[in-house]
């Protein structure tokens, strides 16, 4: 199931003295089965797009198409609710959304809210708990007694229990230590391999290079560049003009290039760099 934004604009607090336009005539397609990243500075419109994808925001103009459902400025909540089951949204610091007295109850809430029986919702909750790498033994614990990393996994399990076709991630590893970040990104990779479409907002270019199949560069509410990570990270001068970085290994390759080493194309992952060194 893919998503497309067609000439989408969005204005915060429209019609008030405080109105601010966040998106300008945005057109982009997120292909079914892709792992699509959005990069750009704070205020570029990335997080606004995330909340348009599952109907939390309605476009001021233009439309968002999710499968065969159209979201526009006139869409009603009853039309949008089924989309929120298909498109799971993981905010930054999703653990702040936890509320129930037990882990099981918290994870099962979403499916039950969409009409799933309590028994099936709890079964889904246990499956999702295992999927995010947590033990069934945590089911009766208060989520607020868990570590920060465990709380985040419980929050993500609550989204996965709704069995979304698309998972939208807004800086999902913010605040985690390196090991926790690695484990979570590995989980998202496995979910992508299982057939879930992933949409990632991040400022970590190494994650874009390692995991994404497509990347969109945002600036001041506009899409300024799209392509594969390999293609986008070749445009070093353009990215630096936008004050955006490249993967660490690409930066290292640029330093080697300055010393006379020649690359047919700049490597964007460590594996690619090693391949170039070994085979030329």
Curated annotation (Swiss-Prot):
Question: Binding of ATP: at which residues?
Answer: 40-47
> What does this chain do?
ATP-binding (A) component of a common energy-coupling factor (ECF) ABC-transporter complex. Unlike classic ABC transporters this ECF transporter provides the energy necessary to transport a number of different substrates. Expression of the complex plus RibU in de-energized E.coli allows riboflavin uptake.
Cellular component, GO, one term: plasma membrane
What is this entry's stated membrane topology?
Peripheral membrane protein
Q: Which gene encodes it?
A: ecfA2
GO MF entries:
ATP binding; ATP hydrolysis activity; ATPase-coupled transmembrane transporter activity; riboflavin transmembrane transporter activity
Belongs to which family? Belongs to the ABC transporter superfamily. Energy-coupling factor EcfA family.
**Main location group:** membrane
Q: What keywords are assigned to this protein?
A: ATP-binding, Cell membrane, Membrane, Nucleotide-binding, Translocase, Transport
SMART domains, alphabetized = AAA (SM00382)
Protein name per UniProt = Energy-coupling factor transporter ATP-binding protein EcfA2
Species, as recorded: Streptococcus thermophilus (strain ATCC BAA-250 / LMG 18311)
Substitution effect: residue 97 to A = No effect on ATPase, 10-fold decrease in riboflavin uptake
Q: Tell me the ranges covered by the ABC transporter domain, including all copies.
A: 3-245
This enzyme's EC code(s): 7.-.-.-
Localization recorded for this chain is: Cell membrane
